[in-house]
UniProtKB/Swiss-Prot annotation:
Function: Nucleotide-sugar transporter that transports UDP-rhamnose or UDP-galactose and UMP in a strict counter-exchange mode.
Organism in which the protein naturally occurs: Arabidopsis thaliana
Positions of the UniProt region annotated as Disordered: 303-335
Protein known as: UDP-rhamnose/UDP-galactose transporter 6
Family per similarity comment: Belongs to the TPT transporter family. TPT (TC 2.A.7.9) subfamily.
Gene responsible for this protein: URGT6
Principal place of residence: Golgi
Pfam families, alphabetized: TPT
GO biological process, one term: D-glucose transmembrane transport
């Protein structure tokens, strides 16, 4: 039997990481939709805080088992990341409340150009013409699928602007911190999850009350709703971990482009489980365009010159690089 090459092994791990993210992301969307629409649990920010609290417990278990090794992340970097991440969560929730669904979807699509800009400015990344065109094709396809009514107001635009930039910065920072401080996905999540859990569980109930005029402590918790909350938190562990793994192995732009496959899958599963309402020709055409764009992007960005860094490297030491290479591969292969 021929030995498996390093490239083949990397491709297999990349595919596994991506499938892990797709399955957990689509799963948590469906569970949260049932929790909020069927059982009336409309406290999205508090629920996210519970997600990170559960993820924190997972990182503590992994630390005890030896999967997470001691590592260092400066407090200023952690604080900056938490600000970006929490503004992203709050901004998305507020944007959805203040904007039409159509403008909310356009705002989400604009994260790809913003992520491209961040990589071009900070990482000196250069994209080929085919890579740029493939990204555009994905945006067109997903836009055709999801964008319907589009109305804009000032406060909604501000909320969307904050949400888009903070989300793009948070995802860029995941990749940046892993490279600069030689942190694998487990290490970084071990640093960030406790801080996000603490801040969101403090801010979340007040923000949710402002958005919904309902108090989280007055919700009618019953066995079924608690089971759904528990299931949502359990799946969120995989969602949070797989996001860090994917962005660490790829880039924020690739994560965003390929991430729209989840949008397509959610639409398809929605039609499958909840009937054919909304399934029409332009939605099907949009799905086909988006998938073709993703295939084109994967091919174009992998070619020489498709996406390359121009003589730029982060200030990591040789010792950090050697330690990160072995530690990251070992831990993420185990995941």
């Amino acid at each position: 039997m021929a030995p498996v090459s390093k490239a083949d092994k990397k491709a297999a791990v990349d595919a596994a990481a991506w499938m892990f993210n797709v399955v957990t992301s689509v799963g948590i969307i469906i569970v949260n939709k049932a929790l909020m629409a069927t059982y009336g649990y409309s406290f999205a920010t508090t629920l996210t805080g519970l997600h990170f609290a559960t993820t924190t417990l997972m990182t503590l278990v992994l630390r005890c088992l030896g999967y997470i090794q001691p590592s260092h992340l400066p407090f200023t970097e952690l604080l900056r990341f938490i600000l970006f991440a929490n503004f992203s969560i709050v901004g998305m929730n507020v944007s959805l409340m203040w904007n039409s669904v159509g403008f909310y979807q356009i705002a989400k699509l604009s994260m790809i150009p913003v992520s491209c800009l961040l990589e071009m400015v900070f990482d000196k990344i250069r994209y080929s013409r085919d890579t740029k065109l493939s990204i555009g094709l994905v945006l067109v396809g997903v836009g055709v699928c999801t964008v319907t009514d589009v109305s804009v107001n000032t406060k909604g635009f501000v909320a969307a602007f904050v949400a888009v930039w903070s989300t793009a910065l948070q995802q860029y920072y995941v990749h940046y911190l892993q490279r600069k401080y030689s942190l694998n996905s487990f290490n970084l999540l071990g640093h960030t999850a406790p801080a996000q859990a603490a801040t969101l569980l403090v801010v979340g109930p007040f923000l949710d009350y402002w958005l919904t005029e309902k108090r989280v402590d007055m919700y009618d918790y019953n066995l079924v709703s608690v089971l759904f909350i528990t299931l949502s938190c359990t799946i969120a562990i995989g969602t949070n971990l797989s996001q860090f793994i994917c962005i660490g192995r790829f880039t924020a732009v690739s994560f965003q482009v390929l991430g729209h496959m989840k949008t397509i899958l959610v639409l398809i599963m929605g039609f499958f489980f909840f009937g054919r309402e909304g399934l029409n020709l332009h939605v099907v055409v949009g799905m086909i365009i988006a998938v073709l764009g993703m295939i084109w992007y994967g091919n174009a960005s992998s070619k020489p010159g498709g996406k390359e860094r121009r003589n730029y490297s982060l200030p990591t030491t040789r010792q950090q690089k050697l330690g990160a290479a072995s530690d990251s591969d070992d831990n993420e292969d185990k995941a």
